[in-house]
């Protein structure tokens, strides 16, 4: 059988205690790449804060309960992105293991959301702040030439939109801000354009290849990605979230 692995380097094995928040966390940080892994123990109380160690405000925060079973919220991967943050009282959340549209769930990051250069806040949801439960968070910040997240509007056309990232992507995650699945593309399974092979995160299905009618198709370019079909998974008449990482970080790339 064939397997697929995506890997990010945080602190290279070193960790440190972080007391910036009301909950003391253990962090492994790669500040150059804008990435930290944050381990903490939940309190079950809304309003708690956790230090993430990045030194800049994270644009993506993924949190998972490591202790509880599926029925107690242990199966949910909460997903925050700064492009969906409207105000401290209106912070939309998605879940990596679900297809649901973003929702303003105050149980995740609290009724008055704080996400800044030192901490992120928590509500009382068991999946992100279960009492005495072991939690893990992955924090990413946009870094010029390496990591870019945001949104775009599809045009439902075979000559689809071009999304500028400032680098040639190696890895790309897309989700429509409707009830739709997460699609992940990378430069290892499709080493040349067109890009058609993708995984869908909320399903246990095998790899999708040119799935749909019309099929899912896009190009990785020197400075972003270009849609080549009108498939609703990534280019219908909707707004889409994306997260991309560079093939050659902080260097000039060429088209392929």
Give names to the regions the model predicted:
Residues 1-256:
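Surface-exposed molecular-recognition determinants
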């Amino acid at each position: 059988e064939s397997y697929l692995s995506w890997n990010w380097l945080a602190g290279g094995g070193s960790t440190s205690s972080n007391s910036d928040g009301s909950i003391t966390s253990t962090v492994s940080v790669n500040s150059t790449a804008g990435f930290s892994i944050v381990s903490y123990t939940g309190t079950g109380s809304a309003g708690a804060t956790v230090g993430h160690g990045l030194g800049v405000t994270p644009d993506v925060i993924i949190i998972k309960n490591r202790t509880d079973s599926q029925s107690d919220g242990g199966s949910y991967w909460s997903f925050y992105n700064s492009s969906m943050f409207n105000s401290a009282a209106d912070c939309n959340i998605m879940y990596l293991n679900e297809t649901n549209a973003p929702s303003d769930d105050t149980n995740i990051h609290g009724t008055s959301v704080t996400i800044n250069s030192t901490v992120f806040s928590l509500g009382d949801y068991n999946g992100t702040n279960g009492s005495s439960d072991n939690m893990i968070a992955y924090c990413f910040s946009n870094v010029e030439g390496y990591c870019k997240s945001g949104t775009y509007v599809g045009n439902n056309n075979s000559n689809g939109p071009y999304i500028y990232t400032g680098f040639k992507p190696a890895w790309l995650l897309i989700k429509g801000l409707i009830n739709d699945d997460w699609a992940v593309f990378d430069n290892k399974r499709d080493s040349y354009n067109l890009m058609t092979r993708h995984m869908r995160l909320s399903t246990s299905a095998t790899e999708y290849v040119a799935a749909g009618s019309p099929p899912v198709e896009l190009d990785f370019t020197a400075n972003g990605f270009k849609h080549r079909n009108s498939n609703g998974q990534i280019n219908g008449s909707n707004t889409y979230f994306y997260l991309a990482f560079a093939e050659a970080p902080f260097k000039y790339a060429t088209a392929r």
